Amino acid sequence: MKYRLYSEGLSITNDLNSIIGQQSTMDTDIEIDEDDIMELLNILTELGCDVDFDENFSDIADDILESLIEQDV
């Protein structure tokens, strides 16, 4: 199953857009499957990050960034 992640207003959006060559800097949609999400969560847990998300993974991008900022990674 694939989920869509929304990164509206994230500070990384401008950098991400410049890398992938998109014109819009307001939002970026990313498709990712559940196995990739779980692998990412395992890596973040090993780094000491505490990431919560709803069952649709819709807020995971914001949660990851918030957790990384709190960990000062």
Swiss-Prot record:
InterPro entries: Orthopox_F14. Keywords: Early protein. Induction: Expressed in the early phase of the viral replicative cycle. Belongs to the orthopoxvirus OPG058 family. This is Protein OPG058.
